[in-house]
């Protein structure tokens, strides 16, 4: 989180703005996914630059439910499994990918409108 000092009247307050948020779950079912989607939306309403990840061992949500259009940036299913009874190994490549995404985000320039104007594409 990034600490921000705000002043309201004569009073100064320090607030924390999330830069990266990671929810960790042993398994992810539909109810937990819905809660994570709501949390991601709340966090991103305060800081749209925040990355929001869910990390779970197994993904136990029906295949008809697709969270791709939610505010969650990625769901990492470390065992690449939909069944918590199977003991597939945790995939270390996924952990490294998550680490690198967080590291790159923390070191990135969040806003470069002038550079985007030069490219001709303002949003992406």
Kindly give the residue locations of the regions a language model identified.
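A sequence-composition feature that detects small, non-aromatic residues
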Residues: 1, 38-40, 88
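Generic recognition of flexible, low-complexity loop/linker segments
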Residues: 9-10, 41
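Short acidic loop-to-beta-strand element that houses the catalytic metal-binding Asp/Glu
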Residues: 1-9
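Active-site-adjacent loop/helix micro-motif of nuclease/hydrolase catalytic cores
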Residues: 6, 27-38, 45
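Conserved catalytic cores of phosphodiester-cleaving nucleases, focusing on short active-site segments
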Residues: 1, 17-26, 36
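Short, solvent-exposed amphipathic alpha-helical segments in soluble enzyme
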Residues: 38-42, 69-71
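C-terminal tail/extension regions appended to the core domain(s) of diverse proteins
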Residues: 48-124
């Amino acid at each position: 989180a990034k600490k921000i000092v705000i002043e309201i009247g004569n009073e100064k307050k320090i607030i924390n703005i999330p830069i990266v948020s990671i929810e960790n779950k042993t398994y992810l079912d539909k109810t937990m996914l819905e809660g994570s989607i709501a949390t991601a939306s709340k966090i991103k309403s305060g800081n749209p630059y925040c990355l929001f990840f869910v990390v779970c061992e197994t993904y136990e949500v029906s295949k008809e439910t697709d969270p791709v259009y939610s505010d969650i940036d990625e769901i990492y299913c470390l065992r690449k499994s939909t069944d918590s009874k199977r003991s597939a190994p945790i995939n270390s490549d996924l952990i490294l990918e998550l680490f690198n995404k967080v590291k790159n985000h923390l070191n990135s320039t969040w806003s470069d409108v002038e550079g985007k104007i030069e490219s001709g594409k303002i949003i992406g």
